[in-house]
């Protein structure tokens, strides 16, 4: 494995869009790429035990926030549950791909745990911020979360974190995020 790419950002800001673009571009250079999510097991638990239908509507997001943070991280005091499981998966399978992209990074330990496990040279962090264009000016994108969901720690805990790269996602202009994806790949190549 060459690198783990960790992508963070607010809900609906383009984390998965960037992950898919990076995957496509890296694969075009002959790399094997896997996209996964820290919430992989959380979503399976929500579907199997909580009758979640897989939709990230108001109720679905509320369930995931409560189950993932309020129950697992806080009530059960298992802050490493999500990151630990995915890092174990990566450790087991790391000889089968070049890059793994995790596109739902929400907490500092979801950055520091893989750094401790695999080394700083193997982890690259990206923050995606989405904007709308209004009269030629960039204005912050407003997602569909409720005010309470927007204030949830899973949406705010990395607001002041220092990332390796900051990506702009301009609504209706995928050229910008594509440009940033090329810059990220150039930086990754420069580190190799």
Predicted stretch roles:
Residues 9-10:
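P-loop (Walker A) phosphate-binding loop of NTP-binding proteins
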Residues 18:
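Hydrophobic positions on the alpha1 helix immediately C-terminal to the Walker A/P-loop
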Residues 86-145:
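ATP-dependent NMP and nucleoside kinases share a basic, alpha-helical "lid"
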Residues 15:
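Conserved lysine of the Walker
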Residues 24-34:
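Post-Walker A helix-loop "phosphate-sensing" segment adjacent to the P-loop in P-loop NTPases
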């Amino acid at each position: 494995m060459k690198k783990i790419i960790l992508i963070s950002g607010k809900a609906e800001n383009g984390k998965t869009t960037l992950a898919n673009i990076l995957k496509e571009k890296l694969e075009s250079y002959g790399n094997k790429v896997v996209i996964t999510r820290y919430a992989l097991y959380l979503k399976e638990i929500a579907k199997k035990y909580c009758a979640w239908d897989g939709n990230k509507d108001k109720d679905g997001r509320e369930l995931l926030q409560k189950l993932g943070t309020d129950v697992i991280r806080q009530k059960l005091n298992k802050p490493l549950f999500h990151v630990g499981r995915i890092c174990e998966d990566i450790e087991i399978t790391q000889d089968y791909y070049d890059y793994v992209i995790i596109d739902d990074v929400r907490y500092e330990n979801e950055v520091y745990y893989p750094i401790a496990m695999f080394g700083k040279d193997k982890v690259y962090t990206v923050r995606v911020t989405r904007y709308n264009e209004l009269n030629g000016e960039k204005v912050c994108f407003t997602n569909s979360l409720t005010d309470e969901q927007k204030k949830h720690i899973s949406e705010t805990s990395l607001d002041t974190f220092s990332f390796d790269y900051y990506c702009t996602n301009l609504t209706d202009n995928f050229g910008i995020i594509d440009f940033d994806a090329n810059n990220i790949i150039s930086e990754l190549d420069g580190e190799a």
